[in-house]
UniProtKB/Swiss-Prot annotation:
A ubiquinone binds at H201. GO terms for molecular function: metal ion binding; ubiquinol-cytochrome-c reductase activity. Heme b b566 binds at H97, H196. Its main location: mitochondrion. This is Cytochrome b.
């Protein structure tokens, strides 16, 4: 009798994806973040579901309902803070996952990479919508400022903004639809994740050398399941420590003040994981130009396979490109810091220089470095 996991139609899919999957024997800890992202997604859906049971998407009661969850619901405070800080863990894993894909040349798997970019946009949209729901000062003004950017789109902009708002300002209709979208998007993300995995398993995983590893593969279970469990334990330790000891470390104190349309906070800023894109948006004086730069800061990832000029896939054996990659990482950290600073003299200039450097490295310097490395290899 054949093994059930190899014969049953449903078990067969799970078996091919997580048990008997042929995996390169040399993939490092950087390949852990895909599974960690899956765990983060499941965790966010479960905690979000429990929060949705008690949340009220009405402008008069939204803030109070969040306070009620924290005060009166059994372990409501824990569920709420795991959900809020879980989003931060999600983005940390996401940025590391994208960084690994860029460093080791995983963008040459075109379908997997492009679905990944769709996932980034969907996750960012979900996080933005979720930030609006507690209906604090930063929620309200963040929603107003970010949705207002769409008015920069020529001809249809102002109508589009009013259509999204469901009126002439951010109000009850806006909050209701944002809640509905925030609830449905994680399930769309789950569907995209399945597509992402499907295309990945068509080609097989990349590895640190960037070479074909068909001659040297091992089953996913038990080797990489054990490795993933270790990553999961470390991530959960960090998340639980953050949630229990310093739950508001990554939040904004302004969001503990109920939304007031008549009082603008001195410094409107999004959550930390959007600050790099926000800094790029602010560094361009023109509204439409800023919006285009904001979208391009993520959309530029689509061009990476076209800008790949080296015969070597990975950066493992390319020291010049490695230097540029780490300058890019430092540049993104600088942009994140600038996004959280007020719009004042030194910060404006630093933001503009960092924004120009970000696009220059990806569009000009990395392809040139690849060409130069080709030349040096021929000597």
């Amino acid at each position: 009798m054949t093994n059930l996991r190899k014969s049953h139609p449903l078990m067969k899919i799970i078996n091919h994806a997580f048990i008997d999957l042929p995996t390169p024997s040399n993939i490092s800890v950087w390949w852990n973040f895909g599974s960690l992202l899956g765990i983060c997604l499941i965790m966010q859906i479960i905690t979000g579901l429990f929060l949705a049971m008690h949340y009220s998407s009405d402008t008069y009661t939204a803030f109070s309902s969040v306070a009620h969850i924290c005060r009166d619901v059994n372990y409501g405070w824990l569920i709420r803070y795991i959900h809020a800080n879980g989003a931060s863990m999600f983005f940390i894993c996401l940025f590391l996952h994208i960084g690994r894909g860029m460093y080791y040349g995983s963008y040459t798997f075109l379908e997997t990479w492009n679905i990944g970019i769709l996932l980034v946009f969907s996750i960012m949209a979900t996080a933005f919508l979720g930030y609006v729901l507690p209906w604090g000062q930063m929620s309200f003004w963040g929603a107003t400022v970010i949705t207002n950017l769409l008015s920069a789109i020529p001809y249809i902009g102002p109508t589009l903004v009013e259509w999204i708002w469901g009126g002439f300002s951010v109000d009850k209709a806006t909050l209701s639809r944002f809640f509905a979208f925030h609830f449905i998007l994680p399930f769309i993300i789950t569907a995209l994740v399945m597509g992402h995995l499907l295309f990945l398993h068509e080609t097989g995983s990349n590895n640190p050398t960037g070479l074909n590893s068909n001659a040297d593969k091992i089953p996913f279970h038990p080797y990489y399941t054990i490795k993933d469990i270790l990553g999961f334990i470390i991530m959960m330790l960090i998340l639980i420590s953050l949630t229990l000891f310093s739950p508001d470390l990554l939040g904004d104190p302004d969001n503990y003040t109920p939304a007031n349309p008549l009082n603008t906070p001195p410094h409107i800023k999004p959550e930390w994981y959007f600050l790099f894109a926000y800094a790029i948006l602010r560094s361009i004086p023109n509204k439409l130009g800023g919006v285009i730069a904001l979208v391009l800061s993520i959309l530029i990832l689509i061009l990476l396979p076209l800008l790949h000029t080296s015969p070597m896939r990975s950066l493992t054996f390319r020291p010049l490109s490695q230097c540029l990659f780490w300058i890019l990482v430092a540049d993104l950290i600088t942009l994140t810091w600038i996004g959280g600073q007020p719009v004042e003299t030194p910060f404006i200039l630093i933001g503009q220089v960092a924004s120009i450097l970000y696009f220059s490295i990806l569009l000009i310097f990395l392809p040139l470095a690849g060409m130069l490395e080709n030349k040096t290899m021929k000597f």
